[in-house]
Amino acid sequence: GASYGYDEINLNVGCPSKKVRSGNFGVFLMKDIKLLSSCLRAMKKNLSIPLTVKCRIGVDEYEGDEFLNNFISSLLNEGIDTFFIHARKAISGLDTKRNRSIPPLKYESVYRVKENHPDLKIIINGGIDEMIKCQNHLSYVDGVMLGRKI
């Protein structure tokens, strides 16, 4: 990583695209924490720069605060301390575009992750299209990730 000029590697386990699902990576990895942990361990072992994770608040039947907190806690064991969290779950069967609009946004779920893990760096993502929304989110989390123009 660093030898190529990168200062951080972010593993996106929040991508719901059909291609990603068929390859058992992306959001699929949120359903297989053992495999994800193994991947992160191998990556961490070979990196001298920070490794972060982008995820969703859930995927299909894997949802709710308990799932998300268990997911985050499991990755803490692998030394991950920065999370980019898309504030909606992914739904299999929806294309990527519809996965950005049909599942409802649940910003409070991301805020609760920060409340439960104040030492983690939590960056919120999803449906943020105005500067005022960015400013509001920063009252609850450490950063805002924009995927679209504002």
Specify the residue positions occupied by each region the protein language model found.
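Flavin-dependent oxidoreductase catalytic cores
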Residues: 1-150
